[in-house]
């Protein structure tokens, strides 16, 4: 992924590959691009998702029932490109599926299928050297996560970040939250002080009010659970051929309403 040039705060949606079906994931990705997405985070379903709350866990179960795997998720990327998805696609996967595939095989497959970056939530920065080196060799940056911990650790992660830096808004799992920590703006300001790459924030961002509050402190917002919950609500309509376009239009409107403050 080339160095991002950020002229306005980015909208980075997260969806789960294969939820509710692989072919519909492609249409959802295109719909999000139409709604103004700058980068897409494509989640790989996993049976033990430590960083995810109940909404994304349920989506992962639905995708696993569709036989979605890490390899199949990677192979969805060129299918998205064929349908007109032009924005960068970041793969969000837990480490175990990467290990099972083999790190070098994983990067070779990701490169062949034009994945633009990867994010591994359960790989601590201190243990990420091999993955970062493979990422540098293949041009697929490992996106680092940074949480509100010690200033020393924040500085270490921020100064070594590739692609962009993903700030975790609060400790704990993903999910829809009514409120965000009062210290979040200070944390983002601290991270931006040390980072040479764009700084984005995610985990719990689920309303346009929260987006509006954060947009002046970061280079982008990641919205996952709120969108995945909407997909869950539209599940039956999305899978009914004569209702699908209507459901996609509703999803597009919802994504635009959440991110209106960014435009």
Curated annotation (Swiss-Prot):
<feature type="active site" description="Proton acceptor">
    <location>
        <position position="41"/>
    </location>
</feature>
<comment type="subunit">
    <text>Tetramer of two alpha and two beta chains.</text>
</comment>
<dbReference type="GO" id="GO:0005829">
    <property type="term" value="C:cytosol"/>
</dbReference>
<feature type="active site" description="Proton acceptor">
    <location>
        <position position="52"/>
    </location>
</feature>
<dbReference type="InterPro" id="IPR011060">
    <property type="entry name" value="RibuloseP-bd_barrel"/>
</dbReference>
<dbReference type="InterPro" id="IPR002028">
    <property type="entry name" value="Trp_synthase_suA"/>
</dbReference>
<dbReference type="InterPro" id="IPR018204">
    <property type="entry name" value="Trp_synthase_alpha_AS"/>
</dbReference>
<dbReference type="Pfam" id="PF00290">
    <property type="entry name" value="Trp_syntA"/>
</dbReference>
<keyword id="KW-0456">Lyase</keyword>
<dbReference type="GO" id="GO:0004834">
    <property type="term" value="F:tryptophan synthase activity"/>
</dbReference>
<protein>
    <recommendedName>
        <fullName>Tryptophan synthase alpha chain</fullName>
        <ecNumber>4.2.1.20</ecNumber>
    </recommendedName>
</protein>
<comment type="pathway">
    <text>Amino-acid biosynthesis; L-tryptophan biosynthesis; L-tryptophan from chorismate: step 5/5.</text>
</comment>
<keyword id="KW-0028">Amino-acid biosynthesis</keyword>
<comment type="similarity">
    <text>Belongs to the TrpA family.</text>
</comment>
<keyword id="KW-0822">Tryptophan biosynthesis</keyword>
<keyword id="KW-0057">Aromatic amino acid biosynthesis</keyword>
<comment type="function">
    <text>The alpha subunit is responsible for the aldol cleavage of indoleglycerol phosphate to indole and glyceraldehyde 3-phosphate.</text>
</comment>
<dbReference type="InterPro" id="IPR013785">
    <property type="entry name" value="Aldolase_TIM"/>
</dbReference>
């Amino acid at each position: 992924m080339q160095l991002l040039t950020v002229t306005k705060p980015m909208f980075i949606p997260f969806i789960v590959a294969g939820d509710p079906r692989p072919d519909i994931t492609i249409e959802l990705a295109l719909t999000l691009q139409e709604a103004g997405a700058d980068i897409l985070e494509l989640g790989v379903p996993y049976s033990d998702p430590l960083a995810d709350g109940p909404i994304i866990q349920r989506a992962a179960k639905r995708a696993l029932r569709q036989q979605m795997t890490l390899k199949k998720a990677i192979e969805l990327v060129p299918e998205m490109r064929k349908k007109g998805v032009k924005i960068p696609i970041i793969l969000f996967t837990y480490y175990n599926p990467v290990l099972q595939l083999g790190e070098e095989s994983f990067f070779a497959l990701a490169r062949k299928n034009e994945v633009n970056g990867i994010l591994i939530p359960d790989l601590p920065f201190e243990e990420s050297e091999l993955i970062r080196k493979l990422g540098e060799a293949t041009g697929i940056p490992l996106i680092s996560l940074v949480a509100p911990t010690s200033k020393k650790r924040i500085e270490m992660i921020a100064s070594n970040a590739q692609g962009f830096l993903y700030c975790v808004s609060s400790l704990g799992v993903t999910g829809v939250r009514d409120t965000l920590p009062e210290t979040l703006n200070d944390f983002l300001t601290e991270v931006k002080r040390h980072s040479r790459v764009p700084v984005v924030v995610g985990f719990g961002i689920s309303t346009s009010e929260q987006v509006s509050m954060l947009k002046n402190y970061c280079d982008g917002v990641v919205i996952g659970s709120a969108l995945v919950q909407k997909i869950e609500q539209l599940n039956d309509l999305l899978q009914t051929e004569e209702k699908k376009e209507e459901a996609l239009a509703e999803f597009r409107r919802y994504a635009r309403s959440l991110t209106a403050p960014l435009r």
